Amino acid sequence: MHRIGGGSVENLRLKARETTLNPSGISLLRAPSPEEAARQMREAFPAAEGLHEAAQVIGSTTVEKIRQAGFDVLPNPTKKLLNHYRLIHPEGVAGFHDVNLARLSAAFTETSGHAV
């Protein structure tokens, strides 16, 4: 499982729009490698320069590690990304607080240099 922009607490924090989703959560991609996740994101959104910039750093983890950190993942395919997942917390928005996010962040390994 891969998070565009890395696995830092700041990048795992819910954005305003993500708090309105049902259930609230952040995007992940299931891909064989961080490089592949970055490539898929760039191909799916060719004009999204901000996403392309963010995709230079990828946070990678496993479903097992996410669950050990107290979170979960749900399949959430989109028209452009069939391998899109949503990372959620059982307590919803309230579960995305700094203590939980620090535990979640520790489950990620970051790689960089995924060229634009």
Language-model-derived ranges and their functions:
Residues 10, 16-25, 32-116:
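Conserved NAD+-utilizing ADP-ribose enzyme module
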